[in-house]
């Protein structure tokens, strides 16, 4: 009997496997030429989440090597940017000296130490004509009250409660102020910003100048904010300019019984053996704006702060930055409320742009939607 297990020296099962492979390739070619199959495959590929990192992983080693070179260049750019911001800080210091005579005069007008001249107090409002018309109408209505109108108006010294009014107008600050803080803040006469000396680490100091009062003996309360303008070695690509990294307050020399940052509570204690009861008093922290001068310290020993402490510290940094960049340079506009209106309008404009963009996107999806023009 002939042996059929081999054909021309090739095992029969190998021949069968080759035939199956050939048939599989032909079937695959036929399937891949089917438009419906291709469309289904494309749809599945489109639904697969795509991330930049997943794309980078697919690149050849030679391309990845060049990308690493680009990252090296980016780090060098970050260090150049850090030097740029250091020079900006030097410029801020230079121009702060030019602003200061104007701020000193502002303080004199606020405190009433100096009365502005007619030329210095002349100001033309954008709504001057409307105000004049309203004044004319009012004068016609109150003709019968001329006698009362001629009475001398009160003329307080300077601009009373100037800085306290700013605290009330600005939400970020008013949220910190308690009712018992208010009479103290009415003694606030000036807020100044002082920059670090040339060659010293970047920092700025907020100075709160108070007139003599019944609450503490300090004439000036200070808050120092320390800054850093260098890329983080662990994450150099996160660098976006100088950042506040820590702050120091000052000791407030409170007069007896006037410290609003603590409150006294009474607590009864019962002796376990004798059963006698005694009342003890102790001081506990109290919410107050003046806790601003006793801030949390940023962790410098490598230990991370808890979430609440991190939030408190970040809020403190934000307030310090706001005093420096907004409140002190534009104080009169926060007193009148004009700067607050500008801030609100800017925020509303941003929201409006987002809503308009969302509407445009919806319109693109609904190609058949009916358009109803507004008349």
Swiss-Prot record:
Domain of life: Eukaryota
Modified positions (Phosphoserine) in chain numbering: 5, 7, 12, 53-54, 125, 304
Function: Acts as a histone chaperone in nucleosome assembly.
Gene3D superfamilies hit by this protein: 1.20.5.1500, Nucleosome assembly protein
Tissue expression summary: Ubiquitous. Biallelically expressed in fetal and adult tissues. Highest levels in testis.
Organism for this UniProt entry: Homo sapiens
Protein name stated in the entry: Nucleosome assembly protein 1-like 4
Post-translational modifications reported in the UniProt record: Phosphorylated at the G0/G1 boundary but it is not phosphorylated in S-phase. Phosphorylated protein remains in the cytoplasm in a complex with histones during the G0/G1 transition, whereas dephosphorylation triggers its transport into the nucleus at the G1/S-boundary. Polyglutamylated by TTLL4, a modification that occurs exclusively on glutamate residues and results in polyglutamate chains on the gamma-carboxyl group. Some residues may also be monoglycylated but not polyglycylated due to the absence of functional TTLL10 in human.
Region entry Disordered, spans: 1-31, 116-137, 339-375
Family: Belongs to the nucleosome assembly protein (NAP) family.
